[in-house]
């Protein structure tokens, strides 16, 4: 029973299919699963599983396709790269397919799939809109300077256009800004 590690779920409009993501202490149990809500005997089917994060479940308007983003193919990296996955509800076997990543033709070299924006389908379901952003910088190496010797200073000038709290808000907005890519 994976219900203890369910992070996100989505039920199709007809109520027949439940999609959910699992984040478990045992990374091999992580994944996106589909379950036939009308049957108590059918076991959940793994659309994608293994170590990594699974985020942003979304259905198209007709409830025939679903999409999500995951870093499962690069989870061991210090700065894992996300991919957008697409699942056709009628597909057999029921595996999701990676459709967009940083190397997809048409994706600018300065952008990658992001987990900051909204993953969505167009109204007619023909396009998948994927959030993209510049790749995150790799984590910095640990500094050996003791905490009591580090200097933290916030410098502000009365001629600044924005007061410091607004500067912080705008900086956070800029860090989380995404661009909409279409597949």
Residue ranges and their predicted role:
Residues 1-183:
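Beta-propeller folds
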């Amino acid at each position: 029973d994976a219900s203890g590690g369910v992070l996100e779920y989505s039920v199709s409009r007809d109520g027949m299919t439940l999609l959910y993501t699992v984040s478990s202490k045992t990374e091999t149990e992580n994944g996106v699963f589909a379950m036939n809500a009308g049957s108590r005997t059918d076991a959940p089917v793994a659309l994608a599983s293994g170590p990594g994060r699974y985020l942003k479940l979304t259905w198209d308007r007709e409830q025939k396709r679903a999409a999500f983003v995951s870093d499962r193919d690069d989870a061991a990296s210090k700065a894992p790269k996300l991919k957008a996955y697409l699942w056709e509800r009628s597909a057999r076997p029921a595996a999701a397919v990676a459709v967009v990543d940083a190397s997809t033709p048409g994706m600018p070299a300065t952008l990658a799939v992001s987990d900051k924006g909204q993953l969505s389908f167009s109204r007619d379901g023909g396009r998948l809109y994927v959030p993209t952003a510049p790749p995150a910088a790799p984590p910095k190496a640990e500094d050996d300077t003791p905490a009591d010797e580090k200097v933290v200073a916030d410098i502000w000038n009365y001629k600044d256009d924005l007061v410091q709290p607004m500067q912080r808000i705008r900086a956070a907005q800029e860090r989380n800004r995404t661009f909409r890519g279409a597949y």
